[in-house]
A protein has these predicted regions:
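PLP-dependent amino-acid enzyme catalytic core
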Residues: 1-309
Length: 309
């Protein structure tokens, strides 16, 4: 296949059955790690920038500034590299060093904020930076309607093509809320039996009505309910702890040969918790958000297995 640039390769990601982790159930995972920037956020990065171009919100001299926990930043950095935009990314210092290096490799500038302030601190800092200069634009992934819209128009359509027989359960994490919103809204029109469950860290259960807090599951659990998240389409939320998320991230690699990130492991742990309520013949879908290669430096996640002869 030939493409004019790398951005044309975003989307059309494969779906794989998890036959070893869940041998007695019909559980599938959509591999968003196969996007060129390595995550599901490539979709919204391109969508937000192209929507802003179409609406005249940005030009070649615009400085783009965005708060991000990592994957959206990587996607924006990749898109900005191709399109030639100046990009500054603001992220909590608790995010992995691999993410920072990836964004820097694409040419983005990085500003770190205190870990205890979470994403709220990164958002506030991005606003502060934008107010200091002229001709700046903040994509605002947590509020930008292009976020769920791209999932309605692409991700959900791909799933419909792959699952003509239907999907019964969507169990997936909430970062911005864009993919669970866009996918669920479209799938429920075709498959009214679909039940959608959000996955969130047990240390920051805001969708479940709890208080925000620091946690170790990078990529989900922003500490607030994002504006783009349609909570009306959710049947509920499943809380997952660090150890469960780490364990399933490790098992996914060792048993299924899929190297995913921590949030992917969290979604698998959530599925394991819900299995008792799921009929064996039901179709369950989750999302692999990114690649585990972004988390080598996370203590206790992936350990070396060196033996001496």
């Amino acid at each position: 296949m030939k493409f004019n640039n790398v951005l044309e390769t975003i989307g059309k990601t494969p779906v794989v059955r998890l036959s070893k982790l869940f041998p007695n159930h019909n559980v599938w995972i959509k591999l968003e790690r196969t996007n060129p920037g390595g995550s599901v956020k490539d979709r919204i990065a391109l969508a937000m920038i192209e929507a802003a171009e179409k609406e005249g919100k940005i030009n070649k001299d615009t400085k783009i500034i965005e708060p991000t926990s990592g994957n959206t930043g990587v996607g924006l950095a990749m898109v900005s590299a191709v399109k030639g935009y100046d990009l500054t990314l603001v992220m909590p210092e608790s995010m992995s060093v691999e993410r920072r290096k990836l964004m820097s490799a694409y040419g983005a500038k990085i500003v770190l904020t205190p870990r205890e302030l979470g994403m709220k601190g990164a958002i506030a800092k991005a606003q502060e930076l934008a107010e200091k200069e002229n001709n700046t634009w903040i994509p605002q992934q947590f509020e930008n309607t292009a976020n769920p819209e791209i999932h309605r128009n692409t991700t959900a359509q791909e799933i419909l093509n792959d699952f003509s027989e239907g999907v019964d359960f969507l169990i997936t994490g909430v970062g911005t809320g864009g993919h669970i919103t866009g996918i669920s809204e479209i799938l429920k029109q075709r498959f009214p039996q679909l039940k959608a469950f959000a996955v969130e860290p047990e240390q920051s259960p805001v969708i479940s009505g709890g208080a925000p807090g620091p946690h170790a599951i990078q990529g989900i659990g922003a500490g607030f309910i994002p504006a783009v998240l349609n909570t009306d389409i959710l049947e509920g939320a499943v809380l997952v702890g660090k150890d469960e998320a780490f364990s399933f991230t490790q098992r996914l690699a060792k048993e299924e040969g899929i190297l995913g990130g921590i949030s992917t492991g969290a979604s698998l742990a959530a599925i394991a918790k819900k299995l008792g309520e799921i009929p064996q013949n039901a179709t369950v879908l989750t999302i692999n958000y990114d690649t585990g290669e972004r988390y080598w430096s996370v203590d206790g996640l992936f350990e070396e297995n060196i033996i001496s002869e």
